[in-house]
């Protein structure tokens, strides 16, 4: 499986997240000004669920945000490395660090 074109939408029914894919997406993230890069697994932007592999390199920052659409959940799984996460309530008070 070639990981050379990471920005194209996946057409395979199964994509394995292996070391080669992690390394490739991380390499692109290191060369991006925001120090992060995602690889889409959903077939189109109109798909009801968006599945992404986000490579977030040291020094990157993701601003606090929320999804108002009740069908738009956000799940994070750390596959390697570590990250800091702050969870806020609807009024902006910190719930969890």
PLM segments and residue spans:
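A broad, low-specificity signal marking well-ordered, structured residues that form hydrophobic/aromatic
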Residues: 39, 51-54, 76, 83
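Short strand-connecting beta-turns/loops that link adjacent beta-strands
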Residues: 46, 90-91
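Conserved short histidine dyad/triad with adjacent acidic residue
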Residues: 35, 53-72
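Glycine- and acidic-residue-biased ligand/ion/polar-headgroup-sensing regions
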Residues: 71-90
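Short, intrinsically disordered, charge-balanced linker/junction segments flanking boundaries
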Residues: 94-97
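Pocket-edge structural micro-motifs
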Residues: 43, 55, 87
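Generic marker of residues within folded, mature protein domains
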Residues: 43-46, 68, 75
């Amino acid at each position: 499986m070639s990981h050379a074109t990471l920005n194209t939408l996946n057409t395979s029914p199964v994509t394995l997240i292996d070391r080669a894919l992690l390394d490739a997406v991380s390499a692109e993230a290191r060369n991006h000004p925001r120090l992060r890069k995602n690889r889409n697994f959903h077939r189109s932007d109109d798909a009801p669920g968006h599945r992404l592999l986000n490579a977030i390199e040291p020094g990157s920052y993701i601003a606090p945000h929320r999804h108002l659409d009740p069908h738009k959940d956000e799940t994070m799984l750390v596959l390697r490395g570590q990250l800091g996460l702050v969870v806020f309530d609807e009024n902006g008070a910190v719930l969890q660090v």
